[in-house]
Amino acid sequence: MDWQTLLTRERLGKPVHSNDELGRSAFHKDHDRIIFSGAFRRLGRKTQVHPVSSNDHIHTRLTHSLEVACVGRSLGMRVGEILREELPEWCDPSDLGVIVQSACLAHDIGNPPFGHSGEDAIRNWFQQAAGRGWLDEMSDAERSDFLHFEGNAQGFRVLTQLEYHQFDGGTRLTYATLGTYLKYPWTSRHAEALGYKKHKFGCYQSELPLLEQITHKLGMPQLDDERWARHPLVYLMEAADDICYGLIDLEDGLEMELLEYSEVEALLLGLVGDDLPDTYRQLGPRDSRRRKLAILRGKAIEHLTNAAARAFVDQQQALLAGQLAGDLVEHMHGPAKLCVQRAKAIAREKIFQDKRKTLHEIGAYTTLEILLNAFCGAALEQYGGHTPSFKNRRILDLLGRNAPDPQWPLYRAFLQVIDFIAGMTDSYATEMAREMTGRSSPS
């Protein structure tokens, strides 16, 4: 792979580059299109790790995505400065920052309500549906898309099909930004076989032609049937997510009183060492722990982004060859690598086992089961031109103009249902499921 091809300004669905808006590069337009999309806006009411809370300090998918985007922009610009002489003439270091920033903004845009438990609930429902014979008419590859449902693949569909220009390029982002978004540029056929991260894949069968087009335009080498090497900038987006995920889990753990401040402080001090800002040294006993943590967190992120940028540059040859094993965190050195690994371990041990989170996950299964039974059941009943019952006609009416056509293959019809349900916020999904079961909202 080479930077000249990897950083093309050409857009999906719009082959000719235009300069019709002064003051914004093609990559800035990508950023703005994601920010103004409805799918991005709805992240504000979707679970990150903990249930959407009355405590405004707890992260949602939206605040997490914004923070990841800030770190991603810094990473892209730092790498861009180092690689300045290797960039194409139309691209400067700030463009790399914007490309990575845009991909970071969109990295969770396809996640369903209720976070990772929502993904698992959808997979579980389709496994039961397969046992009932509901997926029998699909190909093995199509069936696999539902059995391994993945927010990354749904996000790729949102960006390339659903937002703005429906089924005509979607948001029409540049190939460079789409490549940087594609964390897993392969289909569900490889979700289990690769062993990289269980269940992970980035493209449904319905978007496979688009994946082929994007990887061809970017010069991403094909490694196997329906599997390609990753775009190098994906590793910066992934590192930004890992950095923020590790730190914000600890912050949320403090807010929910699942961790002691001294434990988090010790972890971050172990990373930054003596490189403490004067503002931190001047803090007194009357300063809040939130203020202390904010200052310490800022310095910690600086150290982690520096370490990730160094790892990227050190591994550039392997990255451009599509041969880097693992992620950038694995190639970081010293305190930075240990800090991220320890932060994730603390989250697993002390935060993810919280009873409130467990109850929320159980509720997610119930809510999504109600919705999937209703909408997929209605789509199945009308399949092949059959007349649905009055109840199922009314259920399909809720989908409006996005209701599946009776003559569509079941694969396409069920995807349309998933588009609707995965796009819901936690509160909207909960309220709709409650109303479908005849229960009124709590007063």
From Swiss-Prot:
Keywords: Hydrolase
GO BP annotations listed: dGTP catabolic process
Pfam family of the protein (one): HD
Listed PROSITE patterns: HD
One annotated GO molecular function: dGTPase activity
SUPFAM superfamilies cross-referenced by the UniProt entry: HD-domain/PDEase-like (SSF109604)
Span of domain HD: 61-246
UniProt record similarity statement: Belongs to the dGTPase family. Type 3 subfamily.
Protein name: Deoxyguanosinetriphosphate triphosphohydrolase-like protein
Organism: Pseudomonas aeruginosa (strain ATCC 15692 / DSM 22644 / CIP 104116 / JCM 14847 / LMG 12228 / 1C / PRS 101 / PAO1)
Gene: dgt2
